[in-house]
């Protein structure tokens, strides 16, 4: 029995007297929240109340208050407001809980400047939304692996090559694998004796 409470308008077992123990945070709304305030609507049943107009998910000091993810019973705190909760054992935990981010592929809730889903720290092309991977680790000037993106690396698994300017099947870097000694001439690619003239007798030069 609670001597400091005597009325319970909404019938949720939390009293209306705001100065008493276990005061109902929402005295006219039946609720089952117990974590941040008593007796308010808690849709997902995790103990933290759904946010309301006068009770937001973050306090003025930046601490979690109402449920930042009111439809997920495994998450409730989302201090940076990016939609990913801070409980590491819950659904889709925030990998960067102190920064508001939109990444969702390699990590959840981290900065993703180009909006491609990959976090900036893991994206070799953080300002190009069409590229995010460089498997062979060659120069970023060679471009990314996505063949439909900007400036693609035509040989994404060969760190010695990335272009075939003349389209003859031999690659621009003459010192790399399958190199082209004449990168701007599709009729020539080899110059075994190094005299500046191509070996293909049917080609130019």
Residue ranges and their predicted role:
Residues 1-205:
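Extracellular calcium-associated, cysteine-rich motifs in secreted modular proteins
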